């Protein structure tokens, strides 16, 4: 199986081995898989859907290799961006399902959280992330969790660096306001 090179060897696919069986059938190493799972989770994908998301990233990497295209310059960053895009897609699909459900159930009360305050900052941050627009959530996760630089995020998303900075600033401000509003921080 082909695996994109690391930052040190960034331009070639290399043969990799599966970390559990040694059979070479996994295009993502353990660290890359953990990063993909984390980006998906921080992007709001539920735990039950994380294995499917990781498989989608693997599939896209294998499809890229099979098509003969050049390996991503940084497979780990590429996989994080793909995972982030999958999280955005998951939210869009969820929104479509919810809209369909609302049409079918003419008068349905919106589901709200129980309102109980939580002392877990991580839960509050996750809820705050869910409340952000997809584009803002995406750059926030890529910058602060996937630890990508602004220029790398801009390159992977195909937007100007200024757009990434603007989205990042707006997202951080909105998340900070949400956490203060909920009296978490």
Regions found by a protein language model. Name each.
Residues 1-18, 155-156, 172-185:
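C-terminal edge and immediately downstream basic/flexible tail or linker adjoining helix-turn-helix-like DNA-binding
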Residues 3-41, 47-54, 62-65:
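A short, charge-rich alpha-helical start-of-domain segment used by transcription regulators
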Residues 52-59, 63, 73-85:
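Structural recognition of an alpha-helix C-terminal capping motif at a helix-to-coil junction
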Residues 81-102, 117-118, 170:
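Arg/Lys-rich amphipathic alpha helix in sigma70-family domain 2
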Residues 84, 88, 157-181:
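DNA-recognition helix of helix-turn-helix
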Residues 97-122, 127, 149:
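Internal acidic/polar
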Residues 119, 129-137:
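Short helix-coil-helix linker/hinge
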Residues 139-143:
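A short pre-motif secondary-structure segment
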């Amino acid at each position: 199986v082909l695996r994109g090179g690391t930052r040190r060897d960034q331009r070639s696919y290399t043969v990799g081995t599966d970390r559990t069986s040694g059979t070479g059938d996994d295009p993502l190493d353990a660290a890359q898989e953990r990063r993909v799972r984390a980006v998906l989770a921080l992007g709001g994908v539920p735990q039950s859907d994380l294995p499917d998301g990781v498989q989608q990233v693997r599939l896209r990497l294998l499809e890229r290799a099979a098509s003969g295209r050049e390996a991503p310059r940084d497979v780990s960053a590429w996989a994080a961006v793909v995972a982030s895009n999958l999280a955005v897609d998951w939210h869009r699909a969820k929104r479509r399902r919810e809209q369909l459900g609302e049409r079918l159930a003419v008068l349905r009360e919106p589901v709200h959280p129980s309102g109980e305050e939580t002392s877990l900052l991580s839960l509050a941050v996750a809820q705050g992330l869910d409340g952000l627009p997809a584009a803002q959530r995406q750059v926030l996760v890529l910058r602060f969790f996937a630890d990508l630089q602004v220029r790398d995020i801009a390159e992977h998303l195909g937007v100007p660096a200024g757009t990434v900075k603007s989205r990042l600033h707006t997202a951080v401000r909105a998340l900070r306001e949400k956490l203060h509003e909920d009296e978490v921080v």
